[in-house]
Amino acid sequence: TFFAIIISLIIALGAAQTIGPRWLVFSMRMLLNIIRTIPSIIWAVIAVAAMGANALAGVAALTLYSTGYLGKFFSEAFESVDMKVARSLRGIGADSLQSFQYGIWPHAKPLIWSHCIWMLEYNIRSASIIGYVGAGGLGLQLHAYQEFHQWDRFATVLFCILIVVTVLDFLSEHIRRRIARRDGSNDALSD
């Protein structure tokens, strides 16, 4: 998820209509569409074929899949920001980086972090599935426990996954509530 976040932020800057030039927006959106079209399990099969049956193949598969979705989410978060502040900063002499840093990023950041947590939750669940095709991680462990009928260990791993996903779900909900409160207070101030 970490690698996907970094790659997605870079791609999203080019994919956001309010930030990138038109030719780059089209190219980046097309790239994100292609990546998102392929399910994570297929990315896992491709990665296992290219890298062998190991955890690195699982990381590569989830990174590619997550990049497609996070890139789209991030570019939409950037586009949802009211550009008045960024334009005002440019008007008083700020460069593009400063305009982004102070005019766009602070407003998009809460939504972006919420998407990051959601993707982390998704990837933890997906790791269980893609491991079944040899991409390492929790799924490979679950598959081994199933093969040897070690149902107590199988259940323990599933229970741990459930706990982690539940904690991440609560954390994501907390962030979404903070976003809603912040947006509500900003609306009240602008009236």
Q: For the regions a protein language model found, what residue spans apply to each?
A:
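Membrane-embedded alpha-helices of multi-pass transport/permease systems
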Residues: 6-11, 42, 57, 64-86, ...
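Generic hydrophobic transmembrane alpha-helix motif, especially the helices
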Residues: 32-63
